[in-house]
């Protein structure tokens, strides 16, 4: 998996270098690359969730906060594909970027907490949270390039603030809150992935997106 992610970053770096050197990089190519990165981001968050599931307290999911408690829950996003199809490209891209940037601090918290997590696979979990950070940063750079290419949305969207400074004092609370935060990220990464794939389809002018 690490080799695949490394290859993705190298490909994106090549595209960004071409763009910075004045070489024309097509919108379709940029959206294709961004879609591949967002897909890997969501796949990695799913893999992390599966790792946590192997040793998760039986009452953990009952005690876990509801999805409405995610710090990004207040950001208004399309509920389904039909709604998303009616959103202008620049606004949909701005939504994806706002969602992604809202996770800068939470991903940093997850990475710092992972090594001491009360879980037998905390080493693997730590490695994957670092991968999440790297992938998120790569995708963020790609989205900045796309916004420059497509144009800014008339509805300027800012990242949502994250108020959580720690995951709790006891080991079970920390594990449950870690899982909850990751589940929120997994949900948002799925939205980002769907938005970018829809933009890729629309840019290709396909009849059915």
From Swiss-Prot:
Q: Does the keyword S-adenosyl-L-methionine apply?
A: no
The record's Gene Ontology cellular component field reads: extracellular space
- Give UniProt keywords alphabetically: Disulfide bond, Hormone, Secreted, Signal
Cite the Pfam families for this sequence.
Hormone_1
**Can you tell which superkingdom this protein's organism belongs to?**
Eukaryota
Q: Which InterPro entries match?
A: 4_helix_cytokine-like_core (IPR009079), Somatotropin/Prolactin (IPR001400), Somatotropin_CS (IPR018116)
Instruction: List cystine links.
Output: 70-184, 201-209
Q: Which GO terms describe its biological process?
A: positive regulation of cell population proliferation; positive regulation of receptor signaling pathway via JAK-STAT; response to nutrient levels
Signal peptide per UniProt:
1-24
Q: Where in the cell is it found?
A: Secreted
Recorded coiled-coil stretches: none
Single Gene Ontology MF annotation: hormone activity
The record's similarity note reads:
Belongs to the somatotropin/prolactin family.
The name this protein carries in UniProt is Prolactin
Q: Which gene encodes it?
A: prl
